[in-house]
Amino acid sequence: MNSSILVINCGSSSLKFALIDSASHEAVMTGLAEKLGLADACITFKHNGDKQTALLSAPDHAAAMHAIIEKLQQVSLLDSVKAIGHRVVHGGEHFKQSALLDETAINEIERCIKLAPLHNPAHILGIRTAIKEFPSLPQVAVFDTSFHQTMPEKAYLYAVPMKLYRENSLRRYGMHGTSYRFVAEEAAKMLGKPANETSLVIAHLGNGASISAIRNGKCADTSMGLTPLEGLVMGTRSGDIDPSVFGYLATERGMDIQSITNMLNKESGLLGLSELSNDCRELEEAAAKGHEGAKRALEVFAYRLAKYVASMSVGAGRLDAVVFTGGIGENSSFLRAEVINQLGFLGLKLDAAANEACIRGNAGRITAADSVPALVINTNEELMIAMDTAKLAGLAN
């Protein structure tokens, strides 16, 4: 292999990576370092069908990066790495596209910590570690938020005093932008249309879930807001909720802001509604056996999603297709059916057999021939990051 891009996604206690072949766009090696900060921190590598896990020499990001370098050296892949791409959750309004990393860019990412206090500090740690280990290689940041920077003011502003936007950056930002960009391009190919003439509603459904309106290839609206808490029902996040809940729970239960925020982020969503699990697969199995909480959670999830598909159609302007992606979107034929069956008034008619076939990596159309298309598309954020990195590093063909 002549050339590859190392893609890094750094969390507070984890470091996920993928080595992407520049020519084939295939992942040659992937891995995950987890439990960073704990004594049993370990790293798992997947390469050529083999899976190996080893304890790290120290429980930190630097040790994880050293382990990746050693592994790449062992299998003679280290010299193929020509650039490094970093996933960064929040780029604020400054980063409207991916960016080559220098000290100025890193400082701007640090300024966005207030908008993503759980994510951006870890990204900066990963970036600085990678620069130290690979000082001669170009490094690129690819932002979850940048795709959504094309939203018009009417979509991103909250109806609060404008000084809060001007002075405190209070607005809708959105997440999952790298996934949306990849999936929007793939959807246009499946529909046989140019991307800049394609209007879609795309639902990225995983433990974190969001939905976006794409108008002629650009983001026109999205469900996540200032933070990833707004919008759809998620695994453990509530999604949309009346802000007065904070005052109500403070009075009724003596809860403070931090405990309410924690509850809405970590104890709500599918988990809170079902009182069983945040895992969609477990809930579908339990619901099939008659578990009332599981049935309730899935029903609320599907209704909220269907409602959002309808409202996002306004942002899209027209509906060339509805697209499902992410772990749940790509694999839950049950939830896709529950959503589409509520959207007949938008011209969607489910093809049950096609829907059942689109699981475990199978993409395709899941609606009838005379219906507005609904598509299942497998996202590939790592490839999108690698392609951006190659382009900005001057390595693209």
Swiss-Prot record:
Assigned EC number: 2.7.2.1
Coiled-coil portions: none
UniProt-listed GO biological process terms: acetate metabolic process; acetyl-CoA biosynthetic process
Residues engaged in binding ATP: K16, H204, L205, G206, N207, G208, D279, C280, R281, G327, I328, G329, E330, N331
InterPro entries: Ac/propionate_kinase (IPR004372), Aliphatic_acid_kin_short-chain (IPR000890), Aliphatic_acid_kinase_CS (IPR023865), ATPase_NBD (IPR043129)
Subcellular location(s) per record: Cytoplasm
Pathway the protein contributes to: Metabolic intermediate biosynthesis; acetyl-CoA biosynthesis; acetyl-CoA from acetate: step 1/2
GO cellular component terms listed in the entry, alphabetical order: cytosol
Listed GO MF terms: acetate kinase activity; ATP binding; magnesium ion binding
Residues involved in substrate binding: R87
Site keyed Transition state stabilizer: positions: H176, R237
Substrates-to-products reaction catalysed: acetate + ATP = acetyl phosphate + ADP
Cofactor: Mg(2+); Mn(2+)
Residues annotated as catalytic: D144 (proton donor/acceptor)
Keywords (A to Z) from UniProt: ATP-binding, Cytoplasm, Kinase, Magnesium, Metal-binding, Nucleotide-binding, Transferase
Residues annotated as binding Mg(2+): N9, E381
UniProt remark on cofactor binding: Mg(2+). Can also accept Mn(2+).
Family listed: Belongs to the acetokinase family.
HAMAP family, per the entry: Acetate_kinase (MF_00020)
Record function comment: Catalyzes the formation of acetyl phosphate from acetate and ATP. Can also catalyze the reverse reaction.
Subunit structure: Homodimer.
NCBIfam families, sorted: ackA
Protein name, per record: Acetate kinase
Organism in which the protein naturally occurs: Chromobacterium violaceum (strain ATCC 12472 / DSM 30191 / JCM 1249 / CCUG 213 / NBRC 12614 / NCIMB 9131 / NCTC 9757 / MK)
Lineage summary: Bacteria, Pseudomonadati, Pseudomonadota, Betaproteobacteria, Neisseriales
